[in-house]
Swiss-Prot record:
Family: Belongs to the UMP kinase family.
Protein name as it appears in the record: Uridylate kinase
EC number(s) stated in the UniProt entry for this protein: 2.7.4.22
Species of origin: Anaeromyxobacter dehalogenans (strain 2CP-C)
Binding residues for ATP: 19-22, 62, 66, 169, 175, 178
Length: 251
């Protein structure tokens, strides 16, 4: 939703939530965080902040530890999920550091309280940070096991009244099949929430999609690896795949 300050008339969205996977921070590596990739993402975020758009982020932890994977190897699911949440805090702190190095004031709010490294998640405080032009990174998922960071992103987007949820991936939208494995796969330009659920398309998990559907929150799936794509989406360029109501799709 528009903030108290003057909004940028060029931007389609005035308040966004950008969802990054933990893997997005790895770059070409197989584990951990790539400083080069982190810097590139930080500059992408800064480009949008410079437009006057309010930016919140949620980051996964799969580059460090994935709770579901730990559970399949015999770990207790709740314990594994909490470990995954801690991984998201590490990623959030890394991105905060990268953003502040280029002059973007940033706050990390964690759903699991750890006062030495992050603020506790307080919805009203998060909104106030956004209104003051600060980037807010939501860490530790929802703070509960069995919920993905995609669901956390949907929840936080609703709580802060974001105009859109931007789902950053390594491909330029949603396809009928994995384009890396199937050259004949075709990209969807627009999808309804029901299409995503019925076709079991790998946009986000069903809980996250249902939450967005119930609250009319549009989702844009796009390629983060192309520098400048976040800005393009915010300015309304038709890239990636938009998920929303059928009426919006057919407009």
């Amino acid at each position: 939703m528009a903030s108290e300050k003057a909004s940028n008339p060029k931007a389609r969205y005035q308040r966004i939530l950008l969802k990054l996977s933990g893997e997005a921070l790895m770059g070409d590596g197989k584990y951990g965080i790539s400083p080069k990739t982190l810097t590139s993402i930080a500059h992408d975020v800064k480009d949008v902040v410079d437009l006057g758009v309010e930016v919140a982020l949620t980051i996964g932890g799969g580059n460090i530890f994935r709770g579901v994977s730990g559970a399949t190897e015999g770990m207790d699911r709740s314990s594994a999920d909490y470990m995954g949440m801690l991984a998201t805090v590490i990623n959030s702190m890394a991105l905060q550091d990268a953003l502040e190095k280029i002059g973007v004031p940033t706050r990390v709010q964690s759903a699991i309280e750890m006062h030495q490294v992050a603020e506790p998640y307080i919805r009203r405080r998060a909104i106030r940070h956004l209104e003051k032009g600060r980037v807010v990174i939501f860490a530790a998922g929802t703070g509960n096991p069995y919920f993905t960071t995609d669901t956390a992103a949907s929840l936080r987007a609703m709580e802060i009244h974001a105009d859109v949820l931007l789902k950053a991936t390594k491909v330029d939208g949603v396809y009928t099949d994995d384009p890396k494995k199937n050259p004949a796969a075709t990209k969807f330009k627009q999808l309804s929430y029901i299409d995503v659920l019925k076709k079991n398309l790998k946009v986000m998990d069903s809980t996250a999609i249902s939450l967005c559907m119930d609250n009319d929150l549009p989702i844009v799936v796009f390629d983060l690896t192309q520098r400048g794509n976040v800005r393009k989406v915010v300015l309304g360029e038709e890239i990636g795949t938009t998920v929303g109501r059928p009426s919006a799709r057919n407009a």
